[in-house]
């Protein structure tokens, strides 16, 4: 075969062109590629203005990297933050696992100027099930005229072609005026990792010098403690406990457990009750928790087709009124079987997230009628089990759902604690969470969080469980919930292999496990939550006192770059244990002592959870 230079030249040119194109593409991706249309923030239409009596306009801006901004004025409250929002479809493809950075600037204030403005940034699928790669809240600076730069690093949860995903800016956080400018979303592909972008964002946004004031004499709720959900039998497991659950029972202080009552397996036919498979696993769970002196909540997710109808795991199904008696009898038989055959009791019962419909959906009026019928049947069977009030999907809508139940005096004898899930903690208004505490005080009811977590869609993200981001955001959700709602009990979702705290084989704890352990040590049963405030909006502070005389603690969470704080209001000359958790290492302990004024200077590493514990 004879090969000449002339015959090779076309192939060489093709290879050279391909190399040049590949090099250019790599350089372009390493520098980042915008996934939004040009000026999309300024040309898109804000939807749902009528739902909050809102107005939107473009305003001129000086002294910033952008010359125009979107101003949105919200004049009314809405039940959901997406009632008024701007959605922007992406204009470039994105691959699962790509690292992206969103940047925008925000300024404004709530109506009356008493609080910062608030919005939420989301990157999500454009259609149901609205898979979310990120949902990040943002507050403006305290000065409504000051622009605040916000960086949101994240990784893509799925593959998307143009138009298949969108950026959503949610504005319905109560009456407020806010301005947003300089929006960009840059995709770095695989040239940078999400962790690298997270570190970069923290570096560009240092906390700096701060102060935190503790008022140990200003106390609130008394902590019942921390616990968890043990719901794998509800999802089909025939074993009561997996390796993750066993590890957590051994290494965490579990003060309460919530299990799933698998009604679909317990009563597959009307009048038939089977103590086998998933139902038996749940009954064995109750027995084991009773043996450990851990009180139990039993909640229902799914029901049998003959009772509830529809498809298995279908959302939003309403139990027909003519089936109330059948359902009540089935639940009663389960609780009696636990008592008489397993020697175990259930303190409280609920339907999981009945407001949202997972999977039973009840209006408050329907729930009141169900309880009105079930309460006497429980009592006739000799059961002391009471109903949780609410057990709602989120905290923002809890008060609207629970108040009618509390106002119905016919069911008052059958009601237990006010209960909600804090999945919306990082996006809900402070006022919405504070209203939960107010409702508890009004009706003299304890408040519990039956599912504690920060993102109900986290399972959609690529391997999020081992990340420090998961641990840090869990701490933020716990702090806000405890500080505002008056919750005395936090039940993590879950202490089994579902949103796991440790590896599946139960041998390797994840960072989030260490965070839970750190917080439960700082906020033990019997401690009273005490007031604490920080000089910087991003720094979170929570204090407690007791249960022993002279015992106190402070929880500090810094979600941005490194800084320092001076803790004020602590006992003078007190010996303290300082515990620091960051992405690279968790629960690193050292000793310190407050000065004669009760001050303590602390370094706060970037993206850290820090606890200070003082003992008599």
Regions picked out by a protein language model, each given a short descriptive name:
Residues 446-523, 527-538:
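Aromatic/acidic polysaccharide-binding cleft in carbohydrate-active enzymes
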Residues 534-574, 607:
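Carbohydrate-binding surface patches
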Residues 214-217, 251-406:
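Substrate-binding cleft and catalytic face of glycoside hydrolase catalytic domains
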Residues 29-42, 149-159, 172-210, 214, ...:
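Extracellular polysaccharide-targeting segments
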Residues 128-162:
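Extracellular carbohydrate recognition and processing domains
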Residues 51, 72-101, 116-120, 125-138:
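Secreted extracellular polysaccharide-interacting domains
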Residues 58-80:
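Short carbohydrate-recognition loop motifs
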Residues 30-33, 37-42, 46, 70, ...:
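Extra-cytoplasmic beta-strand recognition segments
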């Amino acid at each position: 075969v004879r090969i000449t230079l002339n015959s090779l030249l076309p192939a060489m040119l093709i290879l050279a062109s391909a190399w040049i194109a590949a090099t250019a593409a790599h350089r372009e991706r390493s520098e980042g590629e915008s996934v939004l249309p040009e000026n999309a923030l300024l040309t898109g239409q804000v939807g749902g203005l009528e739902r909050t009596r809102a107005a939107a306009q473009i305003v001129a801006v000086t002294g910033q990297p952008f010359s125009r901004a979107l101003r949105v004025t919200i004049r009314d409250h809405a039940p959901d933050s997406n009632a008024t929002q701007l959605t922007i479809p992406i204009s470039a493809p994105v691959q699962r696992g790509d690292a992206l950075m969103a940047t925008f600037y925000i300024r404004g204030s709530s109506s009356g100027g008493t609080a910062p403005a608030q919005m939420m940034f989301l990157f999500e699928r454009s259609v149901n099930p609205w898979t979310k790669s990120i949902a990040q809240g943002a507050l403006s600076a305290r000065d409504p005229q000051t622009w605040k730069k916000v960086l949101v690093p994240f990784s893509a949860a799925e593959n998307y072609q143009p138009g298949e995903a969108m950026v959503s800016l949610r504005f319905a956080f109560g009456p407020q005026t806010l301005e947003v400018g300089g929006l960009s979303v840059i995709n770095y592909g695989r040239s940078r990792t999400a962790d690298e972008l997270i570190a970069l964002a923290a570096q560009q946004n240092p906390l700096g010098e701060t102060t935190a004031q503790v008022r140990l004499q200003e106390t609130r709720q008394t902590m019942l403690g921390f616990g968890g959900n043990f719901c794998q039998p509800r999802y089909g497991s025939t074993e009561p406990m997996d390796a993750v659950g066993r590890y957590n029972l051994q290494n965490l202080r579990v003060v309460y457990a919530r299990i799933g009552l698998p009604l679909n397996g317990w009563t597959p036919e009307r009048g038939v009750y089977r103590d086998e498979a998933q139902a038996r696993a749940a009954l064995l769970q109750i027995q084991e928790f009773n043996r450990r002196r851990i009180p139990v909540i039993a909640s229902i997710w799914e029901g049998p087709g003959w009772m509830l109808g529809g498809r298995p795991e279908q959302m939003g199904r309403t139990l027909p009124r003519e089936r109330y008696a059948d359902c009540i009898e089935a639940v009663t038989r389960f609780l009696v079987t636990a008592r008489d055959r397993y020697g175990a009791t259930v303190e409280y019962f609920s339907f999981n997230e009945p407001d949202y419909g997972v999977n039973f959906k009840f209006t408050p009026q329907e729930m009141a009628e169900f309880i009105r019928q079930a309460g006497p049947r429980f009592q006739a069977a000799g059961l002391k089990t009471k109903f949780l009030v609410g057990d709602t999907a989120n905290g923002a809508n809890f008060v609207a759902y629970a108040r009618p139940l509390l106002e119905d005096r016919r069911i008052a004898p059958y009601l237990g604690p006010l209960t909600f899930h804090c999945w919306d903690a990082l996006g809900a208004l402070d006022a919405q969470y504070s209203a939960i505490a107010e409702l508890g005080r009004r009706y003299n009811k304890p408040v519990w969080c039956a599912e504690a977590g920060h993102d109900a869609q986290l399972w959609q993200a690529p391997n999020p469980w081992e990340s420090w981001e998961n641990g840090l955001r869990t701490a933020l959700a716990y702090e806000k919930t405890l500080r505002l709602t008056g919750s005395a009990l936090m039940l993590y979702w879950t202490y089994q292999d579902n949103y796991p705290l440790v590896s599946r084989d139960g041998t390797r704890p994840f960072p989030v496990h260490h965070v839970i352990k750190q917080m439960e040590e700082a906020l033990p049963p019997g401690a009273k939550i005490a007031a604490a405030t920080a000089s910087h909006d991003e720094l979170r502070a929570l204090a407690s006192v007791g249960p022993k005389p002279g015992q106190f603690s402070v929880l500090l969470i810094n979600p941005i770059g490194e800084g320092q704080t001076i803790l004020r209001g602590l006992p003078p000359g007190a010996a303290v244990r300082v515990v620091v958790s960051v992405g690279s290492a968790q629960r690193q302990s050292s000793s310190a002592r407050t000065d004669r004024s009760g001050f303590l200077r602390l370094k706060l590493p970037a993206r850290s959870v820090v606890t200070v514990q003082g003992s008599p």
